[in-house]
C-alpha cells in the first residue's frame, strides 16, 4: 500500500497509543517511538509495528508512535487503522487483517 497523506489513529489514554503515519519521501520505513514502557518493551513494540506494516505491504512511511502501555493487539489495530486512513481505503478486506 502506498501512503497518500498523513493520518492518525488512537488516543493518548492509558493502555492505548496514538499512531501518526505519513509518506516518507526518502523511502523505507522510519519509526519514531515515544513510550512510557520503552525501556522494557520498546523492541517488542517496534517488532509489532514493523510486522504489521510488512503484512500490509507498506514499504515507505514515516511512523510516529506515542505509546501509553498498549497491548500488542491494540498496537496492530491502531497501525492498521492509520494505514487504511492514509491510503484512503474504502473497501476493507477484513480477512487480510490479522
Curated annotation (Swiss-Prot):
It comes from Vibrio cholerae serotype O1 (strain ATCC 39541 / Classical Ogawa 395 / O395). The modification O-(phosphoribosyl dephospho-coenzyme A)serine is found at residue 14. It holds the Pfam family ACP. InterPro entries: CitD, Mal_deCO2ase/Cit_lyase_ACP. Covalent carrier of the coenzyme of citrate lyase. GO terms for cellular component: cytoplasm. It comes from the Bacteria. It is found in: Cytoplasm. This is Citrate lyase acyl carrier protein. The keyword Transmembrane does not apply. Belongs to the CitD family. Keywords: Cytoplasm, Phosphoprotein. The keyword Phosphoprotein applies. Oligomer with a subunit composition of (alpha,beta,gamma)6.
Amino acid at each position: 500500500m502506498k501512503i497518500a497523506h498523513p493520518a492518525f489513529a488512537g488516543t493518548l489514554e492509558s493502555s492505548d497509543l496514538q499512531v501518526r503515519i505519513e509518506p516518507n519521501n526518502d523511502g523505507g520505513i522510519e519509526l519514531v517511538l515515544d513510550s512510557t514502557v520503552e525501556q522494557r518493551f520498546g523492541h517488542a513494540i517496534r517488532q509489532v509495528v514493523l510486522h504489521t506494516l510488512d503484512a500490509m505491504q507498506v514499504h515507505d512511511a514515516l511512523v510516529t508512535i506515542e505509546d501509553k502501555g498498549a497491548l500488542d493487539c491494540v498496537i496492530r489495530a491502531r497501525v492498521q487503522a492509520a494505514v487504511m486512513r492514509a491510503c484512503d481505503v474504502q473497501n476493507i478486506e477484513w480477512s487480510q487483517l490479522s
